[in-house]
Regions:
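Active-site-proximal loop/short-helix segments
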Residues: 140-189, 226-230
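Active-site mouth loops of central-metabolism enzymes
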Residues: 5-18, 108-122, 291-300
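Glycine-rich, aromatic-flanked loop segments that form ligand/cofactor-binding clefts
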Residues: 32-36, 58-106, 137-147, 218-222
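Active-site-adjacent "subsite" loops/lids of carbohydrate-active enzymes
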Residues: 73-133, 169-194, 198
Length: 650
């Protein structure tokens, strides 16, 4: 595995700063495999060419000096290509080309239009200048995306609208184009526009690659990627962007800047697993450890959990922001201590896949025919986030449906699933909400779900668990989220009308005691699948009464008794499981501040020998045996609050 540090330009550009950096790197060089030196002026999208030319010889000297003290690989991270935000416009010359314009007419001060021919020429030039410093590699950062360049949904400048009109044979101005894109019946136009955006991203990546390789074809290129759903406005074509850049490196990132809400880490780890899955064949996969704005926002303890989780999510390297030469003694010491375990974990993970449930994501979700949401929204990201809800009950996850026994589908993500894929998904296990059910019925597949939507209600409902085997001891108990606290205007809960063969898991009651109908159903369909539909706050308030007790049982029932990992002894233990022909790896994190009981972990895999490590990579005793079903059973000591275990099994 590889550990890389990214170094801010302020730490290498001036001699006195570089001397301090040099001393720190000399001290820790045995734990540093790679350095990436930032180039550019802050987050704005224009790196003045004259300044870049002035910096390039200095950059070259720094690279030579760092390699001379034993750093194996030293390269460059372009801070900005298109710009992250408008920043420092009072101090830096304005871009000499068109900046991006939003759908609302708002114009960026410093982020260039990605379709402008002058901009593509500038990108080629600026990357070629950086390449003259002869770095081992050049990273494109995560500003290479359509969205969030100060204006949220670009680009609607005159030039872009003219290009789109020529491409599609239309005559539209900004206002008419925006109105048309918002019309539900204009889904083909939306798809054309999103494809237009996708091509713009490919052109930018290609221009950067051409700039680098015009100087030296041996310089490796890489892209820092972001949450797939953040890029739905350009059809989330991460794989195409990597190919256009001829990338040999990928750096999944996005979010989790501090540990104030530590459970958000697992949303990022799911995102990283998805980004990694859409980077097939890329040999160098480095996790981006975010700590923006580059400060001590996280404890060393959380760093250990986060970085081990990243290796479980599919990365084989770690990229940290410029923590040196700042105060890093405790972190660097902890990383030195845990490194042997990380090395073994990366080796064991080779050839394995994550197993668990899959939150379904379709890159074309914003351009689907039955999608009801605005193309100028973040609904796709919200849907994907909702689909990860079973993670809050500790359920192991996988980014790909083919590696899952159960898939979760939220809202109009259902609209984007292809006609070929629907039977494949619904022949296994599916957990979905009432909104997804309605779209499934509109598409002609309602017979796969076992129910249809009934009467809508806007307030005053709770759900009661029925005496079903899935509910166990929760039978007769009530779950009340006090629904009108959360969205007085927009809340709608619909009853479900079960079809023949469907089993009712919960019933909806008014606060005055009136039974208004089913709130959750379970159904075995005619193609062999198991389907659960939840209509009462399917994805929210997962810690309300009954969820921790019933979700694991429901997921196992949807998997037909084959969910790959079951944990007894703690209701807030998040699992990540990878399996392969030669064994499995398991990562457990207690996401509660209370210790668990002794953990009994059942794994649907064989186990000859298991090695257990604590949060800091120290080996612990581990008892492994086979359970009555012939699967691995691990008996692990009680896990402390916000502690972690890593298991490597052969």
């Amino acid at each position: 595995m590889k550990i890389c540090y990214r170094i801010a330009q302020r730490d290498w550009l001036k001699d006195e700063s570089f001397e301090a950096l040099y001393r720190s790197i000399e001290k820790w060089k045995n734990n540093i495999d790679e350095l990436a030196l930032f180039t550019g002026l802050a987050h704005l999208g224009h790196y003045p060419v004259a300044f870049a030319r002035k910096c390039a010889p200095i950059l070259k000297r720094r690279i030579i000096a760092l390699k001379e003290i034993g750093i194996p690989s030293v390269g460059v991270n372009m801070w900005s290509t298109l710009g992250h935000v408008d920043e420092s416009w009072d101090w830096v010359e304005a871009p000499p080309f068109q900046t991006v314009v939003g759908h609302d007419g708002k114009t960026s001060l410093g982020c260039p239009c990605m379709r402008n021919e002058g901009v593509l020429d500038y990108i080629r030039e600026i990357y070629s200048i950086v390449a003259t410093a002869q770095p081992d590699f050049v990273w494109l950062d995560d500003d290479v995306r359509m969205q969030h360049h100060m204006v949220e949904f670009p680009c609607f400048c005159h030039g872009c609208i003219q290009k789109f009109n020529r491409r599609t044979g239309r005559v539209l101005n900004r206002e008419r184009l925006v109105k048309a894109l918002e019309a539900p019946e204009q889904w083909k136009l939306r798809r054309e526009f999103l494809e237009f955006n996708r091509q713009a991203m490919l052109d930018v990546c290609k221009a950067a690659e051409e700039g680098v390789h015009s100087v030296n074809p041996a310089i490796r290129t890489g892209i820092m990627t972001t949450d797939m759903a953040w890029n739905s406005y350009a059809l989330s074509d991460q794989e195409g962007m990597l190919q256009a850049a001829k990338a040999e490196m990928v750096r999944p990132g996005g979010g989790f800047y501090n540990d104030e809400t530590p459970t958000l880490l697992f949303h990022k780890l799911h995102s990283v697993s998805l980004q990694s899955a859409y980077a097939p064949g890329i040999p160098d996969n480095q996790y981006e450890l975010e700590d923006f704005p580059i400060c001590r926002n996280k404890s060393v303890h959380i760093h250990m959990i986060e970085l081990t989780g990243a290796l479980m999510a599919g990365c084989n390297g770690l990229a940290l922001n410029s923590v040196i030469p700042n105060e890093t003694e405790a972190l660097m010491t902890a990383m030195e201590r845990i490194r042997p375990m990380w090395n073994r974990l990366v080796k064991a993970n080779a050839g394995t896949e994550l197993r668990g449930f899959c939150p379904v994501y379709v890159p074309q979700c914003d351009g689907a025919e039955f999608a009801a949401h605005s193309v100028f929204s973040h609904v796709s990201s919200e849907n994907l986030s909702n689909e990860t809800a079973p993670m809050r009950m500790g359920m192991a996850f996988t980014p790909l449906p083919e590696n899952a026994e159960v898939c979760t589908i939220c809202g109009d993500m259902m609209a984007a699933i292809s006609d070929e894929e629907i039977p494949r998904l619904f022949s296994k296990g599916v957990l979905m909400d009432a909104e997804a059910l309605e779209i499934l019925i509109r598409r002609g597949y309602g017979d796969l779900a076992g129910c249809r939507p009934g009467t809508p209600y806007h307030d005053g409902l709770l759900e009661r668990y029925t005496p079903h085997s899935i509910n166990g001891a929760m039978a007769g108990k009530e779950r009340d989220v006090f629904m009108t606290f959360w969205d007085r205007e927009g809340i709608t809960v619909k009853t479900l009308i079960p079809q023949e063969g469907a089993e009712v898991l919960t019933e909806l009651f008014s606060i005055t005691g009136q039974n208004v109908g089913a709130g959750a159903t379970f159904f075995r369909n005619h193609i062999g699948g198991r389907v659960a539909v939840l209509s009462y706050f399917a994805w929210k308030h997962q810690n309300t009464l009954g969820k921790a007790e019933t979700v694991p049982c429901l997921m196992d029932a949807l998997a037909d008794g084959r969910f790959p990992v079951k944990i007894d002894g703690g209701t807030h233990v998040q699992a990540m499981l990878r399996t392969g022909d030669s064994g499995f790896t398991l990562f457990l994190t207690n996401t509660s501040f209370d210790a668990t009981r002794e953990l009994h972990v059942h794994i649907r895999a064989r186990c000859r020998k298991a090695t257990l490590y604590d949060t800091y990579g120290q080996e612990l005793p581990c008892a492994s045996e086979m359970d009555e079903q012939g699967n691995a059973l691990l008996r692990l000591p009680a896990l402390a609050g916000w502690g972690a275990y890593t298991v490597i099994a052969e």
